[in-house]
Amino acid sequence: MKMIIIFFILLILNLIKSQQYGPTWDQINSRPLPGWYDDVKFGIFIHFGIYSVPAFANGGYAEWYWWTLKNPSSDGGATQRYHEKEFGANFTYQDFVSRFDCRLFDANEWASIIEKSGAKYVVLTSKHHEGYTLWNSEQSWNWNSVETGPGIDIVGELTKSVKNMGLHMGLYHSLFEWFNPLYLADAETGKNPTTQVYVDEILMKQLKDIVTTYEPELIWADGDWMQLSNYWKSTEFLSWLYTNSSVKDTVIVNDRWGSECRDKNGGFYTGADHFNPYKLQSHKWENCATIGYSYGYDEYEQATDYQNATELIIDLVTTVACGGNFLLDVGPDAQGTIPNNMVDRLLEIGNWLSINSESIYGSSPWRVQNMTFNIWYTTNTTNGNVYAFVFELPDDGVLILSDPIGNNKTEATLLGLKGEKGVEVSLPIESTKPGITLNIPMVAPQDYPPYVYVFRLTDVE
């Protein structure tokens, strides 16, 4: 009997490992999302490329420099005027590559900063819409970071450093390239091209190359709006990724695989940039956000253009409370350094997460997402605790939480508030109708934990 049970267990495991996902959206969408992604909650997005050299935008999106330069009407001619003034009318976008030297790039330093931020996964632009790749792509001959510019396999070096830190590595990849002649030739007929030369000769080969070479656990597609998914051959690639690739059991993807796909097909949903619905979603989703106005580095952004740590943590909290992941972007400069103002924000978030990690990592949405905009909840299914995130404490120290139902075993703790000998302080608590009332000790402002207050509630319903 024991041998029969073992046989069936092995059979089931083999069937799971050999799961086949055909090239249809029904098949692709039936694949469960690997659990690691929902557990980690917080990641860092990195936009890095030739656009990091001019580092200019008129109102955001500095990574679109080449497009706005070639299409002056898109930003009122601001980029063109800036370009001609700073570099001259005859200076081409390709000329910037010699200034993309990355001479201060240190993959270990980037990974260390990210680890200290509390982020658990990383998404690096392997190729943005400009077509320049951060690895030695055969399809981007003389337009990649190994053969031109810094002479560095940036994808390879950062992948190694990130994985050595115990973090999950992901790669962003643009499906299309603004000015690639093969794509432009395909696209001449509009939304239903009759040829797919660009897809066959460039896109599919590059996607499979980064998967087989670097084994990322996340593929973040973009440029989806330009064509339907059948042009991009998205289901064919995802069928291979989920069935035959070396990362088939752990990899996760987003939903930007065709103009009809967003919030419908693929893995987690992304919506628009900075998507935060402030309500529970039925499907796993991600909020990709910026600290300032650009994803790529913009040297003209001021300190006042950056969100402060409290604002970013509030975005993280409200995202996680509604079942999402928070992907926060940084844009390194052309020398390969992450700007100090961005590093400061990341370290501040990391400080907060070091105190309140149990309320974020591995958490789930509670039965109520928020009481008001200033009070939000998560729960940890492992320990059964509920966590109340409070953005502003009441002046009188009396905090009324109308949603949790307490009993004589209920306890409340303000995470990070220490009493004598550094021991956590249990707060006086009263069961009220509705909810519970907490009496918060009045201490010096510097003795309260920073940014957003998190209350651990035990034995509540």
UniProtKB/Swiss-Prot annotation:
Record's keyword terms, sorted: Glycosidase, Hydrolase, Signal
InterPro entries, alphabetized: FUC_metazoa-typ, Fucosidase_C, Glyco_hydro_29, Glyco_hydro_29_CS, Glyco_hydro_b, Glycoside_hydrolase_SF
Top-level taxon of origin: Eukaryota
EC class name: hydrolase
GO CC terms: extracellular region; lysosome
Region forming the signal peptide: 1-18
Reaction it catalyzes: an alpha-L-fucoside + H2O = L-fucose + an alcohol
E.C. numbers: 3.2.1.51
GO molecular function, one term: alpha-L-fucosidase activity
Pfam short name (any one): Fucosidase_C
Task performed by this protein: Alpha-L-fucosidase is responsible for hydrolyzing the alpha-1,6-linked fucose joined to the reducing-end N-acetylglucosamine of the carbohydrate moieties of glycoproteins.
Similarity comment text for this entry: Belongs to the glycosyl hydrolase 29 family.
Miscellaneous: The maximum expression of alpha-L-fucosidase occurs during aggregation stage of dictyostelium discoideum.
This protein's name: Alpha-L-fucosidase
Naturally occurring in which organism (per UniProt): Dictyostelium discoideum
